[in-house]
Amino acid sequence: MNPLIFTMILLTVMLGTAIVMTTSHWVMAWIGFEMNMLAIIPILMKKYNPRSMEASTKYFLTQATASMLLMLAIVINLTYSGQWSMTKPLNSTASIIMTLAMAMKLGLAPFHFWVPEVTQGVQLSSGLILLTWQKLAPMSILYQISPTINLDLLLLMSILSILVGGWGGLNQTQLRKILAYSSIAHMGWMTAIMVYNPTMALLNLAIYILLTTTTFVMLMVDSSTTTLSLSHMWNKMPLLTTAILTIMLSLGGLPPLSGFTPKWMIIQEMTKNDSMITPTIMAVMTLLNLYFYMRLTYSTSLTMFPSTNNMKVKWQFNNKKLTANLSPLIILSTLILPLSPMLALLE
């Protein structure tokens, strides 16, 4: 793709998200979602092949359906309240439909089926945008309508997402699918706390984006897309392999790494609101995520595969720019927990 055209498309994606996050008019929010959706499709098809075409089509159909539900919710709210403003409380029916639309855009269960398939069908760089930047706009809408969200519906989808995210990743060997199921589980944690403390949900989103970005950049350095290719990494880049071990354990939520911080805070906040059973179920189901990440780190870093000269040639083609950007990302992805006492300021 022409670099100038790619830059324009990328700017359009950012502009669409910025419109959704800053507007106070429902129609402008819908327009922002449409701009974002239409601009991201060429990015998903950057490497043109049948798999990327299929992934882009699945993404388009899912997002178009979600946009239709969003417009339906806007029209219902207009019928009852006569207001286009996002600052006014939503009608209960409109709130439920809008929650379902945002769940579809985020990939929450039971609307999660498109996430692994689309992520697997695109390049690593496109998958990074899909699993990080594309979560910002729907989360900002959920943040704005959080006072009127149906708590039971949101908690049901959250618990289902955590279960599906852990269960679906158990038998995967494709790294992009593993990260997609991990994304579904993380979205479940974020939406679970959205009604109780929306600010904490945004903090959780920021840490999730940081961890996922670090993981994708590491995989792009090595051009690894399967667990088998990742298992040969120790012979070429032992330091980077050690870093991948800690980042993946952080994504799984193992203390004292950064990924444990949001889970700890969410469980603490939910117990403060006299909710005991839900956080217990969520914590137990997260062990599934931790299990497949520990299995991945074992095969990557704790076992030595036979080394051949052909395997060692690949280091010459590493992207030096990506490697230079990894140091601050790795530090932040593993050492946020010591700063967590400062998070008391959120209360």
From Swiss-Prot:
Any Pfam family matching the protein: NADH_dehy_S2_C
Primary localization class, coarse: mitochondrion
Keywords: Electron transport, Membrane, Mitochondrion, Mitochondrion inner membrane, NAD, Respiratory chain, Translocase, Transmembrane, Transmembrane helix, Transport, Ubiquinone
Top EC class for this record: translocase
Alphabetized GO MF terms: NADH dehydrogenase (ubiquinone) activity
UniProt catalytic activity: a ubiquinone + NADH + 5 H(+)(in) = a ubiquinol + NAD(+) + 4 H(+)(out)
Origin superkingdom: Eukaryota
Annotated localization: Mitochondrion inner membrane
GO CC annotation: mitochondrial inner membrane
Membrane topology designation: Multi-pass membrane protein
Coiled-coil spans in chain: none
EC number: 7.1.1.2
One of the GO biological process terms: mitochondrial electron transport, NADH to ubiquinone
Membrane-traversing stretches: 3-23, 25-45, 59-79, 96-116, 122-142, 149-169, 178-198, 201-221, 237-257, 274-294, 326-346
Role played: Core subunit of the mitochondrial membrane respiratory chain NADH dehydrogenase (Complex I) which catalyzes electron transfer from NADH through the respiratory chain, using ubiquinone as an electron acceptor. Essential for the catalytic activity and assembly of complex I.
Subunit structure: Core subunit of respiratory chain NADH dehydrogenase (Complex I) which is composed of 45 different subunits. Interacts with TMEM242.
Protein family membership: Belongs to the complex I subunit 2 family.
Protein name per UniProt: NADH-ubiquinone oxidoreductase chain 2
